[in-house]
Amino acid sequence: MAFVSPAADYYPKQAMKVNYGSTRNIINAIYEFGQQEPPRLVYIGTVAETGDRMPPVHWGRVGDPIKPSMFDYYAVSKAAAERLVIESGLKYWVSLRQMGIIGRAMAEIEDAIMFHNCFDNVLEYCSDRDSARSMKNLCAFFHDGTLEESFWGDIFTI
């Protein structure tokens, strides 16, 4: 679940309540449930956590600092939630920072704030189908035992 732009920018308290609060609730539920085998948490972050892609660095890089764009409350709430995951003490967690997701429904969005992009900037997007395929493959690799142990406890941009 995520509360995204443009709504997150108009209702920043709600963005924090949904994006941070729901992540906190999931982590609490994991601890309260107490399974025999440690659960795996796949958190979906966002490249928006690292802010604008202004020249001379147009593309996201490994190790880019967390630096949400000014007034991007979606990014702020997701960065706070990701930190919660990292500091949760869970043995198996991963944060996947998604690019913008483009799907057919985006054609109906008329609010320019949705894009948070400057005119001389690049666009880092993937399709909704490619995003779903990556999650499907992650589950399949875990299920068939080919997902390496080193995958967990890290952050990836996808």
For each predicted feature, which ranges?
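Conserved Rossmann-fold NAD(P)-dependent oxidoreductase catalytic core, especially the SDR/UDP-sugar
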Residues: R24-F71
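Catalytic helix-loop patch of NAD(P)-dependent Rossmann-fold dehydrogenases
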Residues: K17, M54-S95
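Conserved cofactor-binding/catalytic machinery of classical short-chain dehydrogenase/reductase
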Residues: S22-N25, D72, A80-A81, S127-D130
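Active-site beta-alpha turn of Rossmann-fold NAD(P)-dependent dehydrogenases/reductases
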Residues: A2, V42-T46, R97-M99
